Amino acid sequence: MSSSSSHNSFSGSKTNAAEGQNSIDGLSLKKTTSPFILTAYPSNEEKEVKETDIVPDENKVNELDVHKQSTEFSKQESASNDDDTNIQLIPENNMKIVVPALILTLFLAALDNTIVTTALPTIAEDFNDTSSSSWIGSAYVLASNAVLPAVGVFCNILGRKIVLYICIFFFMLGSALCGASQNMIWLIVCRAIQGLGGGGIISLVNIIISDITPLRTRPMYSGILATAWGAALVAGPIIGGAICQRTTWRWIFFINLPSGGIATALIVVFLHLLPCERTSFKKFLKTFDFIGLVCVITGIVLILLGISLGASSGKWRRANILCYLIIGGCLFVFAFIYDTFTKRNAVLPPPFFKNRSSAALLACSSFFYLNYMLFAYYVPQYFQRIRGDNPIMSGVHTIPCAAVLCFFCTTVGMVLRKLGRYLPLIYVGYISCVAGMGAMICVNATTSMSKVMGLTTIFMFGSGFLFLPPLIAMQATFPPAMTSMATATLMFIRTMGGSIGITVGEVIFNERVTQSFDGNTTYAQLSYKQVERLPQELQIRVKNTYASAFRVIWIFCTVVMAIGFASIFFIKSRPLISNAQSVPAKKKGDSDEKPAEKV
């Protein structure tokens, strides 16, 4: 049937039941093999919308050219703030089942960022290898960062579900192999495999939430995801410490198998996404940005590898470390330049960096997450190294932080849904985080525990405002067809900021402590048990030195947060407006895997 025969008018229109068409404000809707909701984001001026703007032709579903879409979007944006009508198709899902399954999957992937931190001494002792133990955590973070740029591209080529299943498979496989590891090298390699899946899961869950929810109600669900993410990062050291003290450290990884299996089964059965035309292998070879992907991943790994080696050895002028940093930086710059001119689906789409608002959002998210990961990593270290807490008690003392973060992540999602604007929330979050980091500068070795716990909640209060709004703002800045790429790009830049933050914090801490002890690096590596066994006079000196090193870290964080706050002024405010209309459910026997059909 010709697509031109399917247009109806909302005002005084006649419904053609035989053709199975519905119409809203002149926008013709087709029945598909999957139930969906039409979500329209109306503009200030009405424009004629073709049927292909709503349901693309089957032969062109996967020919998404980010550059063309973003160029048209930028031209329209320059003429008016919201001068075009963006259409989003929303599949019907049982949100009471799908959302908890996605949350559990995200929680497990996020948990593995920090769950090993309190178990590192035990694992190192078991394998009799302390020199490589830091790579247990670094391997996961490096692999997670490396896979993020490719997630959005693979989603547009293969579809969300297939990519999600692949990522879950790698995460579960890596978890099983980590639990069965017999030496340190085995464990580190398997942590990298686990990280490939974990990084993809974290990005994909956010992408899928944006696919199954309209923009105006999305903050509520995204707020729940942000709560799960923040809670996992804070709960990781507690759970890891408890497992190590009650049973073997191997259950830190084995625990993912039954939990992940349940979540995967629910996702397979209950998650419904819009049909996706499968691309041919020939078309995949023609459109995928292989050069950009290889350069980005290699560049990231080399940069973080160089920073990590420099931090652990303290010898930044070594030839190998300088080569890692220089070559990695050159590859990353080359990838960005290449993606600016390539006609393929770029791994780092230039429009996200050329658009002033989206570039500011990327900077805002990166600076915040750099501080958040430093905070989440070094506050438990303060409790252990200076206050003498064991891993469990250190986690207990961070419970107020976790409670504040979870409460405000959820609350901000609901407020954002009601308010319809994200910029005021970002301002509140950044101001609170700058104040919280500034207050932490006053903490020393003798500060009362209640005061320390109170000051830490100030930063966590602000953090609750900064997980979700930048993501929603990024999605609102571009058309729905670019949502997956926008989400993946923000997640990649944000996570990379966190990875760099942890490494820079390690550099600051090691350098400060080493200088205080005349170049002796031993004191920077002491565990809380070893500190408590030192002679009283030396113990006091070591703790004061640690407190001084932490103070330098908090000063660094405060400066970075202030720079991030300046980037907010370049973010463009957009109202989150959407209208939804249900379309008849799919017929019996229809499959979600089939592409949309004309009727």
Swiss-Prot record:
Gene Ontology CC entries for this record: plasma membrane
Feature: compositional bias, Polar residues: 14-27
Any GO BP: transmembrane transport
Basic and acidic residues bias (residue ranges): 44-70
A molecular-function term among this protein's GO annotations: transmembrane transporter activity
Places the protein is found: Membrane
Keywords associated with the record: Membrane, Transmembrane, Transmembrane helix, Transport
Keyword Transmembrane helix included in the entry's annotation: yes
Main location: membrane
Region (Disordered): 1-27, 41-86
Coiled coil: none
Membrane topology of this protein: Multi-pass membrane protein
Transmembrane residue ranges: 97-117, 135-155, 162-182, 192-212, 223-243, 251-271, 290-310, 321-341, 359-379, 396-416, 423-443, 452-472, 489-509, 552-572
Biased composition range(s): Low complexity: 1-13
Family: Belongs to the major facilitator superfamily. TCR/Tet family.
Protein name per the record: Uncharacterized MFS-type transporter C16A3.17c
Organism expressing this protein natively: Schizosaccharomyces pombe (strain 972 / ATCC 24843) (Fission yeast)
Phylogenetic classification of the source organism: Eukaryota, Fungi, Dikarya, Ascomycota, Taphrinomycotina
